[in-house]
């Protein structure tokens, strides 16, 4: 966690959690799934977020290091539903989670489009490899104020 990511509360600002998750996803989408920047340049299509939610669980402070774990929860020919957990490598605590639904988009038509066959095969392979992982407890969580009584 860099100094310029720290806010007036003395911890990493929420905007940088979003940026950190986005950068981790760029690597996963590019390197693992083949649906990131290279696909956008070569095939004029790429994933766009439809919906996302972040849970802030434990503060990250100046100098903390972190990593992100990625799990595909579901996929179809055009969409990927995934869950990412940010782990504080100093304390071992879950710092945050990020759940999102993304859709492949034809960048010229600006409409949804199926993932190319090679990307779809990688998505399906990762989905199958993670099939026995437990569904994260926070996946699909609603947002709201809990009322007593």
Language model regions located:
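Solvent-exposed strand-loop boundary residues in beta-sheet-rich modules
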Residues: 90-92, 108
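A structural microfeature
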Residues: 96-98, 114
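Hot-dog-fold acyl-thioester-processing enzymes
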Residues: 1-49, 106-149
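Conserved beta-strand and immediately adjacent loop positions that scaffold enzyme active sites
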Residues: 2, 83, 101
């Amino acid at each position: 966690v860099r100094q310029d990511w720290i806010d007036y509360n003395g911890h990493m600002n929420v905007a940088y959690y979003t940026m950190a998750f986005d950068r981790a996803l760029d690597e996963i989408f590019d390197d693992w799934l083949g649906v990131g920047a290279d696909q956008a340049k070569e095939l004029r299509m790429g994933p766009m977020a439809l919906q996302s939610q972040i849970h802030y669980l434990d503060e990250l402070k100046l100098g903390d290091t972190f990593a992100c774990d990625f799990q595909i929860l579901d996929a179809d020919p055009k969409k990927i539903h995934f869950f990412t957990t940010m782990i504080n490598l100093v304390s071992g605590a879950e710092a945050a989670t990020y759940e999102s639904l993304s859709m492949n988009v034809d960048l010229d038509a600006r409409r949804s489009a199926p993932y190319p066959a090679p990307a779809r095969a990688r998505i399906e392979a990762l989905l199958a490899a993670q099939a026995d992982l437990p569904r994260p407890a926070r996946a699909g969580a609603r947002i709201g104020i809990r009322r007593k009584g």
